[in-house]
């Protein structure tokens, strides 16, 4: 018999991960809710491919030009004569917004140039053409 020493099993230390998992899930929900998603124009457009396409960081206004040369701004069809007035109206809300033109690969170049001229006339500072990487 030993005196003074106890021979008992030592309990293993356990780390409670419940609070850490709660924080991780809250952060995940926060990032999902606050992340910004890229808006599309709402019209099916077959974009041409480009070997040196660069992604646009921020886009405010989307203009889609279909193969039938119909022009859509924010999912509404607009006549080519009304493009500048529509863009001027949209620039009142977002004065520094950039413009992304999503032209179908079969759309006429003249229609794209008319939209670009109207955008410059409306005061758009940044214009980008949407393309897909091959």
UniProtKB/Swiss-Prot annotation:
Q: Which residues lie on this side of the membrane: Periplasmic?
A: 39-134
Instruction: Tell me the Pfam families matching this sequence.
Output: ExbD
Q: Identify one Gene Ontology CC term for this UniProt entry.
A: plasma membrane
Q: Name one GO biological process term.
A: protein transport
For this UniProt entry, the molecular function terms from Gene Ontology, in alphabetical order, are: transmembrane transporter activity
Sorted alphabetically, the keyword list is: Cell inner membrane, Cell membrane, Membrane, Protein transport, Transmembrane, Transmembrane helix, Transport
InterPro entries on file? ExbD (IPR003400)
Q: Source organism's superkingdom?
A: Bacteria
Q: Where in the cell is it found?
A: Cell inner membrane
Gene3D superfamilies the UniProt entry points to: 3.30.420.270
Which spans are transmembrane here?
A: 18-38
- How is this protein positioned relative to the membrane? Single-pass type II membrane protein
Q: Which residues lie on this side of the membrane: Cytoplasmic?
A: 1-17
Q: Which family does it belong to?
A: Belongs to the ExbD/TolR family.
This chain's function reads:
Involved in the TonB-dependent energy-dependent transport of various receptor-bound substrates.
Self-association state and partner proteins as the record states: The accessory proteins ExbB and ExbD seem to form a complex with TonB.
**PANTHER family for this protein:** BIOPOLYMER TRANSPORT PROTEIN EXBD2, EXBD MEMBRANE COMPONENT OF PMF-DRIVEN MACROMOLECULE IMPORT SYSTEM
Write the protein's name. Biopolymer transport protein exbD2
State the species of origin.
Vibrio cholerae serotype O1 (strain ATCC 39315 / El Tor Inaba N16961)
Which classification does the entry list for the species?
Bacteria, Pseudomonadati, Pseudomonadota, Gammaproteobacteria, Vibrionales
């Amino acid at each position: 018999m030993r005196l003074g020493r106890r021979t008992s099993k030592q309990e293993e230390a356990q780390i409670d991960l419940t609070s850490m998992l709660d924080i991780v899930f809250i952060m995940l929900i926060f990032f999902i809710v606050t992340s910004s998603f890229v808006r599309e124009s709402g019209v099916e457009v077959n974009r041409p491919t480009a070997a040196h396409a660069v992604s646009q960081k921020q886009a405010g206004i989307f203009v889609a030009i279909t193969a039938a040369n119909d022009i859509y701004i924010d999912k509404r069809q607009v006549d080519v004569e009304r493009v500048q007035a529509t863009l001027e109206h949209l620039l009142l809300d977002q004065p520094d917004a950039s413009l992304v033109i999503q032209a179908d690969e079969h759309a006429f170049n003249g229609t794209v140039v008319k939209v670009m001229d109207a955008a410059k006339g409306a005061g758009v500072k940044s214009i980008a053409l949407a393309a897909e990487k091959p």
